[in-house]
UniProtKB/Swiss-Prot annotation:
One of its GO terms (cellular component) is cytosolic large ribosomal subunit. Keywords: Ribonucleoprotein, Ribosomal protein. GO terms for biological process: translation. It comes from the Bacteria. This is Large ribosomal subunit protein bL17. It holds the Pfam family Ribosomal_L17. The gene is rplQ. Belongs to the bacterial ribosomal protein bL17 family. GO terms for molecular function: structural constituent of ribosome. Part of the 50S ribosomal subunit. Contacts protein L32.
């Protein structure tokens, strides 16, 4: 029987899964698009949707709840200052999952998970800023 099987274990312990999804949420918030395996993307979707809902609420308690799940304060700041207002009118469905072929090494099915109305310039912005800062320093 299939009782009490509410999520995928992904061959990881509870602590490892929690840390992995926390890191993936931070990466998705920062870059607004990440490439991962299909099962991880499907498990990440409800987690990040709940984070956006917290950001739409916008109060102090919601900010503290989000900070308890995310590892970096810059991700919490972007979540509440950029993503929350962006999706204020949308009632759910903040992310999409698109199939992206298979990984070369082990043929794992890959997917791209991204925000629906994402900022195209957000992906790689930190790297571009770092390269420009290094160029200015020289």
């Amino acid at each position: 029987m299939r009782h009490a099987r509410g999520y995928r274990r992904l061959n990881r312990t509870h602590e490892h899964r929690k840390a992995m999804f926390s890191n993936m949420c931070g990466s998705l918030i920062e870059h607004e698009q990440i490439k991962t395996t299909v099962p991880k993307a499907k498990e990440l979707r409800p987690i990040i949707e709940k984070m956006i809902t917290l950001a739409k609420r916008g109060d102090l308690h919601a900010r503290r709840q989000a900070a308890s799940q995310l590892k970096q304060d810059k991700d919490v700041a972007k979540l509440f200052e950029v993503l929350g207002p962006r999706y204020a009118e949308r009632q759910g469905g903040y992310v999409r999952i698109m199939k992206a072929g298979f990984r070369y090494g082990d043929m794992a099915p890959m997917a791209i998970i991204e925000f629906v109305d994402r900022d195209v310039d957000a992906k790689g912005a930190a790297d571009r800023a770092r390269v420009e800062a290094e160029a200015d320093a020289e």
